[in-house]
């Protein structure tokens, strides 16, 4: 079930909107979390466990860093300036070690799943015999969106370490931040400070937001299904039989391919933005997507 599928737009979203609106205000965030996990499970099945593991680790690291800051505040009570400086440096080192531990675990899992097989295959080719054959993750599937929520988790832990945000004490809030369904598969990577003001409010649906959201969603569908998919027919025809065409046609196909890629990604981003808009959730980072789209596709 992709963002541009009929099931997502005409079944999943309406049911989610209805459940969200009927739920008590304080439970609406949990409703979004439940539907986010359902969406991810429909996409990846049991690979949901990676998202759950990342959520648990991120939450624990955030709490750990907060506890260290609390201990530091208590430890410096009644001390002079010089002693406070020594204690502060000591706790900064402790916090840095905790942060590095969390980052290494997350990047270790991501690197193993995404790149270990690539490196071992090339090393085996280079040396002429299998390298680390027993460690290759051939039977492991790649969780959808793991790069996005891993980097988002690292950003959250880093912000807690630097004191720019307070760590969440309720794990469902951390889980919703990392797993909110409109951005779990394609991004964008949001900072906690960009979404916190709207993600957890649980405010009721507003007519204007629903209308604007669906207009944005259908505009994204138009880009994907009418422009990108139609462009793909021409591009594939030329690229699959390039020997039958002259240079001008091949150049036109290459330009068409760039347009296809841009419209696919731009259309998907419009659907994502529109999905968030339905609930009145529109992170600051979403407003800068146009520059991001251009850079990513070109």
What is each model feature region?
Residues 1-296:
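Membrane-embedded transmembrane alpha-helical bundles that form the catalytic cores
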